[in-house]
């Protein structure tokens, strides 16, 4: 998740050049082909990326600026750099997938750690190059339509935050995140709710979170921000709403939806969450993708044909699900470690929604909130296509309520946690805060333990990500409402927007003619909808 804006910029530049139709530029291997050659996942080759070579290519761009290269000569060097940049993240993605498939594999652990620990250098090189280009004498020529485009460098005026100190802090953060994965691998063999866990791995994880918060606060300060929250929103996630808006929104959810959450009939959920095989999970998504047709069906054909998924259970796998884009092959990959229950059908659908977005846009450059709209939106739409599954519909609506409340609680916790400083920032204070947030949001209907925040990976590896689940769920729910009222409308809106280049969430919902979750009275409307569905 490091410097999401940089990756968005890299991908955006590639897409702009694909569709620019420029005839006076020899793009060579640097541009996206119209129809990429299909490569099966098993045939993808891993080569350890070389950040030293990438930095030399970055220096060649800097030297070209100083030597007075013309636009074409300079852009040749820029694209040579981008080739190495995408090759680096291709290797990183492959190492990620292979290591997470088997956390006991020492080779892939070393490769993944290597890629993780060097990612800050790579992103720093890109950032510094773009700032240098923004300050070069031929900037206006580089912003011509056939190159970067008008106004491209507006976001790169002034000084880059990626100086030696900031890069060192980012590398330190990456090392700490790697330590969390190591501890997670150890915890996989333990009862994570036992005292043995909390006094062992759990205790180490808790202190690790304190250390991560400290490093992140230092990163924000080094970048010139007063607090980490604003830094994360603006620099990491490029959001077009503020932490203050988020906290007000979470307050509305606490007021409107927590009472409904507390009185929800949990038996409806558990009774519907029946056992489910891997084959059933696969066929659920395939059947609905085929019923939806269009880009969704095409994306599933690619996934199935090239084997771009792993939904098989293993106690050696990382206990999570995700989708990742493999840049140089122009193909996404879905990873799920299933539970053996019906929820796996929705989990696979969720990650396949990300797959569709990446497939349609050759590597999506949208913000995290918009990306989550496509994953959660496909979950809702799957209920309206293929063979009717009443149990799953009940589960999804219950899950919608759970998501609003539980993910809001998690978001509230990490927002408050990153405000703790000095003597206040301790393991004991974090445990007390998590305990209180659980009570505030009604989570104490479960066997709630303030120490259990260490079991939420996003706190450690994707800080400030969780709120994206909440705001995007609101927009995704609107797709379902459209589809129920007028069959086909929700799906059309989904398919029409899959290739969007609109990065900001509020800008996206406006362009898609959806309501903002921050609109006054919106949470009350959601409450009424859920009350009607779950009565």
Please give the residue ranges for each predicted region:
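Positively charged n-region of N-terminal signal peptides that target proteins for export
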Residues: 1-7
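Hydrophobic core
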Residues: 13, 17-21
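A well-structured
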Residues: 27-279, 502
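C-terminal, non-catalytic "cap/extension" segments appended to globular domains
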Residues: 156, 348, 356, 411, ...
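Active-site-proximal, well-structured secondary-structure segments within enzyme catalytic domains
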Residues: 210-337, 396, 402-409
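Post-HExxH zinc-binding segment in Zn-dependent metallohydrolases
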Residues: 250, 256, 361, 366-403, ...
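Short pre-active-site segment immediately N-terminal to the catalytic Zn-binding motif
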Residues: 333-348
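Short helix/loop segments within enzyme catalytic domains
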Residues: 382-405, 417, 421-422, 486-498
């Amino acid at each position: 998740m490091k410097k999401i804006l940089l990756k968005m910029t890299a991908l955006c530049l590639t897409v702009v050049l694909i569709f620019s139709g420029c005839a006076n530029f020899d793009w060579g291997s640097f541009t996206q082909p119209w129809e990429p050659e299909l490569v099966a996942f098993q045939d993808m080759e891993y080569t350890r990326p070389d950040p030293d070579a990438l930095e030399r290519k970055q220096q060649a761009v800097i030297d070209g600026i100083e030597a007075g290269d013309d636009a074409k000569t300079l852009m040749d060097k820029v694209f040579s750099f981008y080739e190495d940049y995408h090759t680096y993240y291709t290797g990183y993605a492959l190492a990620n997938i292979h290591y997470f498939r088997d956390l006991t594999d020492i080779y892939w652990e070393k490769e993944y750690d290597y890629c993780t620990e060097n990612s800050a250098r790579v992103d720093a090189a890109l950032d510094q190059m773009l700032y240098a280009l923004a300050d070069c004498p031929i900037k206006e020529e580089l912003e011509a339509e056939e190159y970067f485009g008008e106004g491209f460098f507006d976001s790169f005026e002034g000084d880059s935050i990626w100086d030696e100190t900031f890069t060192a802090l980012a590398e330190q953060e990456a090392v700490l995140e790697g330590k969390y994965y190591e501890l997670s691998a150890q915890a996989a063999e333990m009862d994570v709710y036992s005292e043995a866990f909390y006094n062992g791995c759990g205790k180490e994880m808790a202190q690790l979170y304190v250390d991560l918060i400290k490093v992140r606060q230092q990163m924000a300060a080094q970048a010139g921000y007063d607090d980490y929250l604003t830094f994360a929103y603006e620099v990491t996630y490029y959001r077009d709403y503020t932490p203050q808006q988020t906290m007000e929104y979470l307050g509305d959810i606490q007021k409107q939806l927590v009472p409904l959450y507390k009185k929800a009939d949990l038996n409806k959920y558990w009774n519907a969450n029946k056992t489910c095989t891997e084959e059933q999970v696969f066929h659920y998504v395939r059947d609905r993708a085929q019923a939806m047709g269009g880009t969704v069906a095409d994306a599933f054909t690619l996934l199935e044909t090239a084997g771009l998924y792993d939904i098989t259970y293993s106690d050696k796998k990382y206990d999570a699900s995700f989708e990742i884009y493999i840049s140089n092959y122009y193909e996404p990959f879905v990873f799920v470690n299933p539970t053996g229950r019906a929820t796996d059908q929705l989990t696979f659908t969720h990650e396949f929604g990300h797959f569709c977005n990446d497939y349609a846009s050759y590597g999506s450059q949208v913000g995290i909130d918009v990306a989550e709209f496509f994953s959660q939106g496909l979950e809702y739409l799957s209920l309206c296509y293929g063979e009717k599954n009443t149990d799953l519909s009940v589960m999804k609506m219950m899950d919608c309520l759970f998501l609003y409340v539980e993910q809001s609680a998690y978001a509230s916790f990490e927002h408050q946690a990153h405000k703790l400083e000095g003597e206040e920032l301790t393991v004991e204070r974090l445990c007390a805060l998590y305990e209180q947030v659980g009570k505030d949001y009604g989570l104490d209907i479960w066997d709630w333990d303030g120490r259990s925040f260490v079991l939420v990976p996003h706190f450690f590896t994707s800080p400030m990500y969780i709120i994206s689940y909440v705001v995007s769920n609101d927009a995704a729910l609107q797709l379902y409402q459209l589809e129920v009222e007028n069959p086909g409308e929700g799906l059309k809106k989904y398919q029409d927007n899959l290739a969007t280049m609109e990065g900001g969430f509020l800008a996206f919902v406006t362009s898609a003619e959806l309501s903002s979750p921050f609109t006054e009275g919106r949470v009350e409307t959601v409450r009424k909808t859920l009350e009607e569905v779950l009565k």
